[in-house]
């Protein structure tokens, strides 16, 4: 439903994104969640905010996964190089992620691109640790040792035997990362570091709080984006559990 709303918002609302009405209208058949202080339909704003929220979540998660996969794989190397990348993972594990993000976001431009870069830069550690653990496990398997004994090149072993066995862990980490990336974006946007020209659900909560929605009793304006954030995060989490279970079944064979 959320993905459909992101790609086909006109199927869910017949109002335009910037179509204005009387401010602070209550919930009615014409305006399901009422209108905000500027007269925008809150339900329509929620539908169009789905696209921006998913854009940040999926893009930053994909970037974090790519970075984490590379660093995680390189950390399994023997010698100095492997120790450096493993040390890098350990350093980022100890960093207070949210506080660091807030400090850096205060110096960034506040655009969607800046948010994606910042969130991705601090979301790769989980993927790196999972990939590192999986690669070490695979390297200890008899079929990998047989490939080495038979003289297959490292490229052949990686492409034909390592990468195919990483699919489930990559998908699980990707979906879990979307969950955390959406939460981080929502937190930063609520604190005022989001892009005002591309409002997400977090930005909606920020606007609602600043414009006195609570005082006016416009609880729909405050609660609806928060409920959507929770439901979307829960959906990605449940899908990630499926891939984690598959990974455990395959590892147990």
Give the ranges of each region predicted by the language model.
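Transmembrane alpha-helices
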Residues: 51-67, 155-187
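Generic hydrophobic transmembrane alpha-helix motif, especially the helices
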Residues: 32, 36, 76-77, 81-137, ...
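C-terminal transmembrane helix and the adjacent membrane-cytosol boundary/short C-terminal tail
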Residues: 121-122, 175, 217-253
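Transmembrane-helix boundary motif in ABC transporter permease subunits
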Residues: 9-10, 56-90, 102
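Periplasmic/extracellular loop-to-transmembrane helix junction in inner-membrane transport proteins
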Residues: 17-60, 207-224
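N-terminal signal-anchor/first transmembrane alpha helix
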Residues: 1-17, 88, 166
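Glycine-rich helix-loop "coupling/hinge" segments at transmembrane-helix boundaries
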Residues: 106-108, 135, 184-224, 228
């Amino acid at each position: 439903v959320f993905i459909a709303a992101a790609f086909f918002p006109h199927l869910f609302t017949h109002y335009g994104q910037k179509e204005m009405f009387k401010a602070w209208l209550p919930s009615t058949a014409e305006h399901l969640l009422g209108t905000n202080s500027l007269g925008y339909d809150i339900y329509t704003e929620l539908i169009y905010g789905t696209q921006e929220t998913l854009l940040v979540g999926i893009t930053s998660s994909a970037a974090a996964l790519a970075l984490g996969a590379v660093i995680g794989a390189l950390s399994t190397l023997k010698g100095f190089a492997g120790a450096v990348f493993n040390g890098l993972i350990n350093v980022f594990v100890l960093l207070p992620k949210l506080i660091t993000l807030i400090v850096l976001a205060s110096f960034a431009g506040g655009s969607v691109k800046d948010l994606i870069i910042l969130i991705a830069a601090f979301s790769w550690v989980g993927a790196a640790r999972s990939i590192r653990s999986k690669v070490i496990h695979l390297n200890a398997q008899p079929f990998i040792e047989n490939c080495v004994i038979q003289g297959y090149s490292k490229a052949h072993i990686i492409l034909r035997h390592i990468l195919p066995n990483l699919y489930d862990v990559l998908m699980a980490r990707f979906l879990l990362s979307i969950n955390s990336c959406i939460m981080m974006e929502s937190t930063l946007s609520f604190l005022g570091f989001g892009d005002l020209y591309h409002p997400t659900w977090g930005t909606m909560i920020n606007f609602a709080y600043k414009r006195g929605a609570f005082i006016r009793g416009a609880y729909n304006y405050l609660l609806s984006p928060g409920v959507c954030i929770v439901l979307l995060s829960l959906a990605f989490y449940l899908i990630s559990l499926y891939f984690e279970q598959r990974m455990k079944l395959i590892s147990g064979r």
